[in-house]
Amino acid sequence: MLSLDLQSRQPIYEQLVRGLSELVSLGALAPDEQLPSVRSLARDLGVNPNTVQKAYQELERSGVIYSVAGKGSFVSPGPAAARMLRGQ
């Protein structure tokens, strides 16, 4: 799903933001599809849950994902991921 370069100068949360945005824009993650929980994604990637939470917060702020209390995070419908990748 996602690969991280732990030796990169780019922060891990930024790598997560970019990777998830790419998956959304390529259609690998469909609109309204539920994302993995913060804890499960952190465990799978071997990173701190706070790192994943920061990435999810950035994606939500940018409109790529949305959160539902008690349910999780989901892919937003619309072109937000493509705009984010283009730097707009």
Where are these regions (language model features)?
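Extreme N-terminal segment that seeds HTH/winged-HTH DNA-binding domains in transcriptional regulators
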Residues: M1-Q34, S40, M84, Q88
